[in-house]
C-alpha cells in the first residue's frame, strides 16, 4: 500500500445511496350484486345509493343489470373496502328481511 499514490488514509468519504421501496398497488376487487326472485328492485337501488354512493340513474342501471343478467358490478375497491361493503349490504338486507346477496372477486 505504500506504493499506492491514490490511497488517502485521511479521506472520510461516505457514499449514501437511497433506494425508494417498490410498493405494489393493491389487487383490485369487484363487488358483485346477485339477483334473486324476492328482493324488490327499489331496495336494490336503495342499497346501491346508500353503500356505493351512486346517483339514482347509475343505481337504476346497475339494478337492471342485476335483474336482467343475474349479476351486476357495484364497484371496484381494495380487498378490505370490498369486503366491508359486501358485509354492509348483506347485513342491511337481512335486517330488512331480504335475501339479497353480494360477493367479491378479483378484478
Swiss-Prot record:
InterPro entries xrefs: ClpS, ClpS_core, Ribosomal_bL12_C/ClpS-like
Alphabetical GO biological process terms: protein catabolic process; proteolysis
Ranges of compositional bias, category Basic and acidic residues: 1-12
Origin superkingdom: Bacteria
Region annotation Disordered: where it falls in the sequence: 1-21
HAMAP family hit by this protein: ClpS (MF_00302)
Entry function: Involved in the modulation of the specificity of the ClpAP-mediated ATP-dependent protein degradation.
Listed NCBIfam families: PRK00033.1-2, PRK00033.1-5
Assembly and oligomerization: Binds to the N-terminal domain of the chaperone ClpA.
Family membership: Belongs to the ClpS family.
Full protein name: ATP-dependent Clp protease adapter protein ClpS
Organism taxonomic ancestry: Bacteria, Pseudomonadati, Pseudomonadota, Alphaproteobacteria, Sphingomonadales
Amino acid at each position: 500500500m505504500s506504493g499506492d499514490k491514490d490511497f488517502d488514509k485521511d479521506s472520510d468519504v461516505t457514499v449514501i445511496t437511497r433506494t425508494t421501496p417498490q410498493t405494489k398497488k393493491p389487487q383490485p376487487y369487484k363487488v358483485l350484486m346477485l339477483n334473486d326472485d324476492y328482493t324488490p328492485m327499489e331496495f336494490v337501488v336503495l342499497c346501491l345509493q346508500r353503500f356505493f354512493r351512486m346517483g339514482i340513474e347509475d343505481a337504476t342501471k346497475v339494478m337492471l343489470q342485476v335483474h336482467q343478467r343475474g349479476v351486476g358490478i357495484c364497484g371496484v375497491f381494495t380487498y378490505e373496502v370490498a369486503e366491508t361493503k359486501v358485509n354492509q349490504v348483506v347485513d342491511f338486507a337481512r335486517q330488512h328481511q331480504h335475501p339479497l346477496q353480494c360477493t367479491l372477486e378479483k378484478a
